[in-house]
Amino acid sequence: MGNKQAKAPESKDSPRASLIPDATHLGPQFCKSCWFENKGLVECNNHYLCLNCLTLLLSVSNRCPICKMPLPTKLRPSAAPTAPPTGAADSIRPPPYSP
């Protein structure tokens, strides 16, 4: 009696939500939580949330209070991050400091 083994939680590889840095091309799209932000929006099922509201909502629950679906926790940036080449910093030197 009571000698059952608990199942290990399945680690599902959830899809990444799209991060939209500027939603002006989508028409009048705003965060459905604060209704203020239209930049830095994240897709949450059938609506958008700004990063500030998403962070706040994730600190309280993993479910969206608007659509009741799981909140997105992984983001897919709309543009690949870039950085200058490692050798570029050596060839460009700032001018000497003079007070």
From Swiss-Prot:
Motif, PTAP/PSAP motif: chain positions: 81-84
Span(s) of short sequence motif PPXY motif: 94-97
BP terms from Gene Ontology: viral budding from plasma membrane; viral budding via host ESCRT complex
Predominant place of localization: virion
Extra information: Inhibition of host myristoylation by the compound DDD85646 leads to proteasomal degradation of protein Z (and not lysosomal), strong inhibition of Z-mediated assembly and budding, and reduced levels of viral replication and transcription.
UniProt family annotation: Belongs to the arenaviridae Z protein family.
Protein name (Swiss-Prot/TrEMBL): RING finger protein Z
Organism: Lassa virus (strain Mouse/Sierra Leone/Josiah/1976)
